[in-house]
Design a protein with these regions (language model features):
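Carbohydrate-interacting regions of secretory-pathway proteins
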Residues: 1-324
C-alpha cells in the first residue's frame, strides 16, 4: 500500500519493524527487521535485506529471554539484541504475552505463519534438606520478581542471571527484601578478568563497599589484577578482611559459594573450602586495612546485591536462610 509501515509485536511489545526502504523521510532506508522502539539497545538492522515492494519477504524471528535475533530473507539483521519494554522501560520485557501483527493504515499481507516454542529451563528447586532447614529461593532461573535495581543489564537467560554491562559499569541488582543474619547460597561463573561483588546489609544507594559491606567476586588470577592489595582478592570483605586464595574454579566453570552473616561474624565458603572466617568489628576496631571510612560496615540489616564493575558474569540457583 501507500507508504507501507507495519511491524510484529513480540510478547505484546513493539516491534520488529516492517517498512518501505524508499521512505527516506522517516529513516526507512536502514531496512526492515530492526527493533524500532529500542532506545538503549540497537534499534536498526545490521543491513538492508528487503525485497522490492510487492514481493514476498521471509522473516525468521527467535526470542530467548529478553533477546531477539531476526533473519530477513536469510540475512541476519538483528543479532541477539534486548527488546526493551516499550510500555515501562524501567522493567524487563514481559515473560509471556501474545504475538501481534500490526499495520499503520497501509495495506500489508502476512502468510505462512508458524511458531515453535523453545522449552524454558526447569525452575531451580531446593533440596529436601534445604527445605527442612528453612531456605527460600531468591532466584529460580525464571524471573527477577524478587529483585530491584538494574534489570536492563542483568537479564534472565537460560536459567541464569547474566550481566551484560552496557555502559561500562553494569550497575547493581539488589534483593527487594532486607536481611540481617543469614546463610546465602549461590553459584557464579566468571569471564576472563571479571570483577563483580556481593553486597550485604547494604542500602540501595551509595557505594555498597562502604555504605554496607562488599564481598569480592573477582577473577583475581587475571594479569590485570597482579598488583592487588590483599583485601581485594575474591571472597574478601573489601578493604577489611582478606580471604584465602587459590580455590576458584577456572574461568568458564561454575563456582559454588556460601556466605554466612551472623552478627559481626562473616564466613565465606567457596567450592567447599572456607576462605574467610572473621569478625568485622574486631577487624576494624583500630581502623580498616584500606584506611578508609566504612560507615555501613556494622549495619544490622540491608539488601543483598550483585555489584557490577563492567564485566560479564553469570549467577544461578540463589537461595537464603534467615538466622534467628
Amino acid at each position: 500500500g501507500p507508504e507501507p509501515d507495519a511491524g510484529i509485536y513480540l510478547r505484546g511489545t513493539p516491534q520488529v519493524q516492517i517498512w518501505d526502504t524508499a521512505r527516506t523521510n522517516v529513516g526507512a532506508e536502514v531496512g526492515s527487521g530492526g527493533l524500532y522502539n529500542n532506545q538503549q539497545n540497537p534499534s536498526k538492522p545490521l543491513k538492508v535485506a528487503d525485497q522490492k515492494v510487492g514481493e514476498w519477504n521471509t522473516f525468521l524471528i527467535r526470542m530467548i529471554g529478553e533477546r531477539v535475533s531476526v533473519w530477513l530473507n536469510g540475512e541476519l539483521v538483528t543479532d541477539n539484541v534486548i527488546l526493551e519494554n516499550f510500555w515501562d522501560r524501567s522493567q524487563l520485557i514481559f515473560p509471556v504475552e501474545q504475538i501481534e501483527l500490526q499495520a499503520h493504515g497501509s495495506k500489508v499481507a502476512y502468510r505462512d505463519i508458524f511458531i515453535k516454542e523453545i522449552p524454558r529451563p526447569e525452575p531451580f528447586k531446593l533440596s529436601s534438606e534445604e527445605e527442612k532447614e528453612g531456605f527460600r529461593i531468591l532466584f529460580d532461573g525464571t524471573n527477577l520478581d524478587q529483585w530491584t535495581g538494574n534489570k536492563r543489564d542483568y537479564a534472565v537467560e537460560s536459567g541464569n542471571i547474566v550481566l551484560h554491562p552496557s555502559q561500562g559499569s553494569g550497575g547493581n541488582l539488589y534483593t527487594k527484601d532486607q536481611f540481617d543474619n543469614f546463610v546465602f547460597r549461590f553459584e557464579f561463573m566468571l569471564t576472563p578478568g571479571a570483577n563483580n561483588g556481593l553486597g550485604i546489609r547494604t542500602p540501595l544507594e551509595g557505594d555498597a563497599a562502604y555504605m554496607g559491606m562488599e564481598l569480592q567476586i573477582l577473577d583475581n588470577d587475571a594479569p590485570v589484577y597482579e598488583k592487588l592489595a590483599i583485601y581485594q582478592y575474591h571472597g574478601s570483605v573489601y578493604g577489611v578482611i582478606p580471604a584465602k586464595r587459590g580455590f576458584l574454579k577456572p574461568v568458564g566453570e561454575w563456582n559454588y559459594q556460601e556466605v554466612i552473616a551472623d552478627g559481626d561474624h562473616i564466613k565465606v565458603i567457596l567450592n567447599g573450602t572456607t576462605i574467610l572466617d572473621g569478625n568485622i568489628r574486631e577487624a576494624s576496631k583500630n581502623g580498616t586495612m584500606d584506611k578508609r571510612e566504612h560507615p555501613g560496615l556494622l549495619n544490622k540489616t540491608g539488601h543483598i546485591g550483585f555489584l557490577g564493575h563492567g564485566s560479564k558474569v553469570k549467577f544461578r540457583n540463589i537461595r537464603i536462610k534467615e538466622l534467628k
